[in-house]
């Protein structure tokens, strides 16, 4: 069995989905292999991204020789996805409809000067919301809202689901949760990790006593479009474009529900959210006149600095991450041999930002450094065991969640407008890879964030795909004024009260890194009490400078 070079799951930059692939033979030149059946791949991409340079063509030829199966997979899948079938409900079906144009037309006077009450280009966005009857689904007894952000100009519709805090919603902070992928629904985070309930194999609701909404209100957002309950006739294929949508959603949501706009607001997420969150936070902070009280960001097992992080796949797979080796000495040496070329390709992507540099880097590096581990059948999200359910990204619960969310009564209760719900949309995953988004150096945004807000990077130590070694390494390699102080900071134990140690933390200035024991890619699922503990302590300002 051969594997694709990209397919993330649950938000991981993984190569987890098997595709039927064949190595091209015959008399074709290497570059001729990169064609979509019935159309020229090159002409399609040059129309969108500009003409390929001679240097770029040489790189593509090289990658085709080094990773022919991976390029063949690319060829087969470089086809624009079809729109997600959906049927928009009348505005009369919703309890609230907020027009972005109306919000944008609001002006206030400050120091004798008039300016917009809420900055940003909101005129093409609208927000729809409905109050969810807690008794209808039994997820939680708290106040809930669901709905869509509509980009009317581009036919994009982002689904969200809000749960009020179980504790003190008038004063508790608000958290936006984002799963990764790119292309995985944040409702998987709701039901598998940190939401108020989970779904069992009989599709029954099971209460989560360690839900993150114990002491915070939480918004779960399906983004980018065509993920989960979100849909569009067009698509988003890069993180920056997705950031504009998220800013509009939050601006209109807090306008409609001002009772939550004064509370502290935090963005949290995992995996490819390591790309999303720096960009989304930067977009929010770029608007001086805003109704979003952003106080911090949290990234769990994220992909943020690929140049640094990809250097730690071999150590993690070969017994240097705290768990037994998965690969033999020969395979480990082959990964060591592949790393310099991988890092040179990523560095070219970092410097040029061009799709012609970034896509070959993704194809080669994923094939060389993730592929060997994946072919063992070991779970890329948890090095401690095998992938038990490959049809559901190793976790049967993902299938239960999809089945539950596809029930007509559930979709009706939430106002969902799509014909079907999918936990992960691999077309989106490929779109982001094909647009060169995978290795964009968004970690370079983090120093600017640290000037204004605290940043927490946490990592379960059993994850392979976005492992703790790589996450620790990029936090220490990050160039910012507090780098020396952070790297010399004392590493302290993490424990619930006087209980058993569940991890280690290092913090200096506005920057904090946590290693969490016995947790894979999805920390709140594997260590629910520990994740609840560090979340509440973080929101309470324990590690803030």
Swiss-Prot record:
Query: Which subcellular locations apply to this protein?
Result: Vacuole
Which UniProt keyword terms apply here? Carboxypeptidase, Disulfide bond, Glycoprotein, Hydrolase, Protease, Signal, Vacuole, Zymogen
Which residues are connected by disulfide bridges in this protein?
184-424, 318-332, 342-365, 349-358, 387-394
Which Pfam families has this protein been placed in? Carbpep_Y_N, Peptidase_S10
Cellular component terms (Gene Ontology):
fungal-type vacuole
Query: Could you list the residue ranges that cross the membrane?
Result: none
The biological process GO terms on file are: proteolysis
Point out the signal peptide segment. Answer: 1-17
Q: What is its EC number?
A: 3.4.16.5
- For this protein, what is any one GO molecular function term? serine-type carboxypeptidase activity
EC class of the enzyme, as a word: hydrolase
Residues listed as glycosylation sites in the UniProt record: 215, 510
- Annotated active site: 271, 463, 521
Q: Which residues make up the pro-peptide?
A: 18-130
Q: Please tell me where this protein is predominantly located.
A: other
Q: What does this protein do?
A: Vacuolar carboxypeptidase involved in degradation of small peptides. Digests preferentially peptides containing an aliphatic or hydrophobic residue in P1' position, as well as methionine, leucine or phenylalanine in P1 position of ester substrate.
Entry similarity comment: Belongs to the peptidase S10 family.
Its name, as the record gives it, is Carboxypeptidase Y homolog A
Supply the gene name.
Answer: CPYA
